[in-house]
């Protein structure tokens, strides 16, 4: 992903728009397939920035800046803004908006897909998130080597409620458990369809994600790997998730790798697959968690499982 120099967006790039419309209208056709719904309500935009607790020394990552309605407000508070945008037309609009102003020196525009790009360090993330990257963005932010202190993100309302869901809630899922392990999540505001241009088909909500410090002393991928198994059928017993051939094959392979690192071998006459199955069944039975349903299990119960599996040499990533 390359930095977008200002000169790239001068001249013809600023005059032309999708569908042959002229730049003088300051309007081009939004690509809703990319989740382009511009936040037009200045009060909502200011509320998002205010909730981000930006310090004068902060570098802020903005995902999907669009035409810059949030960006210009972030620039007033932050030391630097890195805006990641896939659409060159949007990048052109944003560049033009700050051109010749003091804020121009504080803004770096990166063209490309935020999910596929290695990101530089940043303190805060703000995003009017394209809905199709909601889950990948959350996981990418939490799995950064140095996760942002605060993320204030706009999502489809139902997705936002999944982040906040508790055991027993209908929306409680792997995402809920995962995010709440690494961060405190709070609801900032609900945002109606009429606050966007063009209006999306659903209501939106803004959430604030504040990472835990210190970070929980578990491996991100191990935790996520366990939850993937447990939530394959969240309303079935956890036992059921560990009986699929695909899951057993992965755990058997990982167990074999663990044995090699420990300098151990399977006793002659033993079947590795049977050994792994026996270990899994013993853990699920001894903890009493095997007969529980993931939809009703809390963080403590999943942590108990992960610790017991690791003691037995069974890993998930």
Curated annotation (Swiss-Prot):
Might you give the EC number(s) for this enzyme?
A: 2.1.1.183
Which InterPro entries does the record associate with it? KsgA/Erm, rRNA_Ade_Mease_Trfase_CS, rRNA_Ade_methylase_Trfase_N, rRNA_adenine_dimethylase, SAM-dependent_MTases_sf
SMART domains given for it?
A: rADc
Q: Name a Pfam family for this protein.
A: RrnaAD
Which residues bind S-adenosyl-L-methionine per the record?
37, 39, 64, 85, 113, 128
Where does the source fall among the domains of life?
Eukaryota
Which Gene Ontology terms cover its molecular function? 18S rRNA (adenine(1779)-N(6)/adenine(1780)-N(6))-dimethyltransferase activity; RNA binding; rRNA (adenine-N6,N6-)-dimethyltransferase activity
**Which keywords belong to this entry?**
Methyltransferase, RNA-binding, rRNA processing, S-adenosyl-L-methionine, Transferase
Q: What are the GO BP annotations of this UniProt entry?
A: rRNA methylation
Q: What class of enzyme is it?
A: transferase
Which parts of this chain are annotated as the region Disordered? 1-22
Q: Which reaction does it catalyse?
A: adenosine(1779)/adenosine(1780) in 18S rRNA + 4 S-adenosyl-L-methionine = N(6)-dimethyladenosine(1779)/N(6)-dimethyladenosine(1780) in 18S rRNA + 4 S-adenosyl-L-homocysteine + 4 H(+)
> Function, please?
Specifically dimethylates two adjacent adenosines in the loop of a conserved hairpin near the 3'-end of 18S rRNA in the 40S particle.
Q: Which NCBIfam families match?
A: ksgA
| Family in the record | Belongs to the class I-like SAM-binding methyltransferase superfamily. rRNA adenine N(6)-methyltransferase family.
PANTHER family for the chain: DIMETHYLADENOSINE TRANSFERASE (PTHR11727), DIMETHYLADENOSINE TRANSFERASE-RELATED (PTHR11727:SF7)
Q: What is this protein called?
A: Dimethyladenosine transferase
Question: What species is given as this protein's source?
Answer: Yarrowia lipolytica (strain CLIB 122 / E 150) (Yeast)
What gene does this protein come from?
DIM1
